[in-house]
Design a protein with these regions (language model features):
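Positively charged n-region of N-terminal signal peptides that target proteins for export
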Residues: 1-4
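Bacterial N-terminal signal peptides
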Residues: 7-18
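Non-catalytic beta-strand/loop surface segments
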Residues: 20-58, 63-65, 90-125, 161-215, ...
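Short pre-active-site segment immediately N-terminal to the catalytic Zn-binding motif
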Residues: 64-72
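Active-site SXXK
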Residues: 73-87
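A common structural junction motif
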Residues: 134-142, 236-244, 315, 354-365
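Non-catalytic, conformational "gating/processing" segments within enzyme and secreted inhibitor domains
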Residues: 151, 204-236, 435
Length: 465
């Protein structure tokens, strides 16, 4: 639930007043799910919801950009694109016809740890989409033509979605330099050079290694008959063999930080200078993740948040200021970022950011601040659970990334149980000077003449098709 829930919170409009002031009494609807595992290793999770005649289908593959081969960054994302090409019995782009032509939708996204494909269709098309997902798992056409066409698409996406934005290089640098050992430092979207160096044989090997039933979780939420679903899953998925190849997992551990590091990043077309801090934090499974998420919400959710009030409204030294937790399967980052107002300097912004983080360590947050953050979270999750897609992705993330599908039901109560003392404790533990990397993002014109070329590009946050 971590990333999906937090992205919803970021977009939510805070409901003020006393709408959810009794959060302790607010009961989130529980997801009553069924779970089974086929002999070939495919995990199947399902939730019946007959509130509308629709169904959401998700396939979660436990492979992401951290699994890209060395010097082949971008493979997981590239393969997300190739999965929409032809199969033995489907023409290219047929997934669009099977969904959009009946009033549904489909898409996919790649993150550091997973690649996810999903469809939402009228429930009488469930069997068709199950067949289609089994078809592209078992008999995808990976040939030179499909490989080259999708590589070109991804390279153009790289240019348009990352190189073009004025702050793209900053976000790339945050991951690239904040991680020193773990492959999280590689961009999800890859690099032009690595994609150019790739061959179709490389792609086929990647597919054979990771796209297999024992590395997939099928999630179905909506209007269906459970017995009929089981029969269709057996018919289309149970016949797919489990390969004899070993399933590799990343074993690299990111070392602890022992001293503050500083980075000066330069890029063309920088409209506002930036100052960012990253702090290394543990896996999203760690018990401290709840308090870290609440700390980020208190720092930057809404115009009454601490960072906005201090840096943007009162001191007027920043055009924007934010904090976020990027929690992942192996390790994460707590990131604080501000863009400097015209006429102000990065040094004073850095000083003020540090002061606000120190306040979290020095004293517990107020009851009112904590209540506001809780209200935002409840509001967002209630909205999320209104849709089949929202429920299916929450359940899928709990199963694949948190290791327990029931975390979809227990995570929210855990988050709401965070206390001011918990927030103060994790602030002292993780938001300390020795665990901080500092980044300045400056115009290329300010680079010392002995410097190197512009920094790379960003592709984090989940690449979509």
């Amino acid at each position: 639930m971590r990333r999906i829930l937090l992205s919803l919170i970021a977009a939510a409009v805070f409901i003020g007043g006393s709408a959810f002031m009794g959060h302790a009494q607010t009961k989130m609807p529980q997801m009553v799910f069924r779970e089974r595992t086929l002999k070939n290793g495919l995990r199947v999770l399902s939730v019946v919801d007959k509130s509308s005649p629709t169904v959401a289908i998700n396939v979660w593959y436990h492979v992401g950009s951290k699994d890209d081969p060395d010097h082949r960054s971008g493979f997981a994302h590239l393969f997300e694109h190739i999965m929409f090409k032809s199969t033995k019995d489907m023409k290219a782009e047929m997934m669009d016809r099977l969904t959009e032509d009946v009033g549904g939708e489909n898409n996919a996204f790649t993150q550091d740890d997973v690649t996810v494909y999903y469809e939402v269709v009228p429930s009488n098309y469930l069997e068709t989409l199950l067949w289609a997902e089994a078809e592209r798992l078992s008999s995808l056409t990976v040939d030179e033509a499909n490989f080259k066409s999708e590589r070109a698409v991804v390279q153009e996406e790289y240019r348009q979605s990352v190189l073009a934005p004025p702050n793209g290089r900053l976000f790339y640098a945050l991951d690239q330099k904040s991680f020193v050992a773990h492959p999280y430092k590689r961009p999800t979207i890859g690099s032009i050079e690595d994609l150019d160096a790739a061959t179709v044989d490389d792609v086929i090997k990647f597919h054979n290694t990771y796209y297999r039933p024992d590395n997939a979780t099928l999630v179905i939420v909506g209007d269906f008959d459970p017995k009929q679903l089981d029969a269709w899953v057996d018919k289309y998925f149970a016949v797919i063999p489990k390969p004899n190849l070993a399933l590799p997992r990343v074993q690299v551990k990111e070392p602890e930080r022992t001293a503050e590091k500083r980075f000066m990043e330069y890029a063309p077309n920088v409209p506002l200078k930036g100052v960012a801090f990253t702090y290394l934090v543990p896996s999203e499974k760690n018990e401290d993740s709840d308090a870290l998420e609440m700390a980020a919400a208190i720092l930057s959710r809404g115009r009454s948040s601490r960072l906005y009030q201090s840096l943007v409204y009162q001191q007027q030294i920043a055009a924007s200021a934010s904090a976020r937790t990027d929690l992942r399967e192996d390790a994460g980052l707590f990131t604080v970022l501000a863009f400097v107002s015209n006429g102000k300097n990065p040094e004073e912004v850095e000083k003020s950011l540090k002061a606000e983080l120190q306040k979290l360590q020095d004293a517990p947050v107020s009851a009112a601040e904590l209540e506001k953050a809780r209200n935002q979270i409840i509001t967002s999750e209630l909205r999320n659970r209104e849709t089949d897609l929202g429920k299916s992705q929450t359940l899928g993330e709990a199963a694949v990334l948190l290791g327990d599908p029931n975390r979809a039901n227990t995570d929210l109560p855990r988050l709401l149980a965070v206390t001011p003392a918990d927030i103060q404790r994790v602030a002292k533990k993780y938001l300390k000077d020795t665990n901080r990397d500092v980044f300045y993002y400056l115009p290329e014109s300010e680079r010392p003449k002995t410097g190197t070329g512009p920094v790379g590009i960003n592709a984090k946050g989940g690449q979509g098709r």
